[in-house]
Structure formats: C-alpha cells, structure tokens
Amino acid sequence: MSRLDSMIRRLLAQRACLEAVAEMIEDLPGPVLEIGLGNGRTYDHLRERLPERTILVFDRVLAAHPDCIPPLDTFFLGELETTLPLAYKRIGATAVLAHADIGSGRGDHDSANAALLARLLPPMLRARALVVSDQQLHCAELKPEALPEGIPTGRYFLYRCIK
C-alpha cells in the first residue's frame, strides 16, 4: 500500500472513531484532551463537532495552521511528561475524551510515547471516559472497545476508562 493510501485510511479511521465517540459522550460532562495538535485538522474537527466542550491541546511545538491554533489558556506547549501533569493539576480526573495522535512512524519512539501516555493519561480521565489513539495503549484502566464498522483492527484504537 502506498503511503498516500495508508494516510487516507488512517484519516478515515480517525474520523469514524471521533464521530462515534462524540455520540457516546453526549451525556457525560467534562473537557476533551487533544494530544498532538500537529497542523490542527483534528482539533478543528473536534471544536466543530463538540462546540460546547473545553478542549485542552498538547504538543511539543506549535506548527498548526493559523485558523487552528487553540486559545493560549487551553494550549500546553512542551513535552507530555511535563504538560500532562500540569493539566491534571488544573482539571483533575474530569476529562471525558482524549484523542492522541502521537505516532511518528518510528517504532521505538512511538512505543516509548505510547507507554508514557498509558501511564500519565488515566489519572486525568473520569469514569467511562473514552480514548481514541493512533497508538496501542497498554494500561489496566483502559479497556479496549470495538472500533466502528469497517475500521480494521490495529488501524486505530479505542478505549474506555474503567476506574
């Protein structure tokens, strides 16, 4: 499969997962975490799809399209091992949804980031919160959920927090 085809399939899976979880969290309060702003496409989609939610955004560098830059009071710039604990101090265990797009295509790097996220993310999540991730997360508090129909296993990952 070409890299273009792979990217298209990944983006289709991402959108399908985000659409599914948006409906699943309708009756649950709490902010949304967008981990990995990148150029801001997913953040833009989330703020359009979930306009009533506060969206906290995390990235190492700010490289988003100017129309997709979050407000400064919701943007955490820096490494996840620093920024996620800062956000936890602010919101506690209230996040209802976390979307993580942290893959780089470099296996060892991605595995290390996924392990870090699996350790730091669950304390920030409320019971029954959902996590959508481009990386597999191994954590006792995150139970794998079924992906939307048509999304192949391993293309994207969906979890529910079972506190």
Question: Which residues fall in each region the model found?
Answer:
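Class I SAM-dependent methyltransferase Rossmann-like catalytic core
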Residues: M1-G30
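A generic alpha-to-beta junction signature in SAM-dependent methyltransferases
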Residues: E26, L50, I91-G92, M124-L125
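Conserved class I S-adenosyl-L-methionine
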Residues: L28-G38
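Glycine-rich SAM-binding Motif I of class I
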Residues: G40-D44
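Conserved SAM-binding motif I beta-strand of class I
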Residues: R53-D59
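S-adenosyl-L-methionine
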Residues: V61-G92
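Short SAM/SAH-binding signature in class I
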Residues: A93-G103
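C-terminal substrate-binding/active-site "lid" region of AdoMet-derived donor-dependent transferases
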Residues: S104-K163
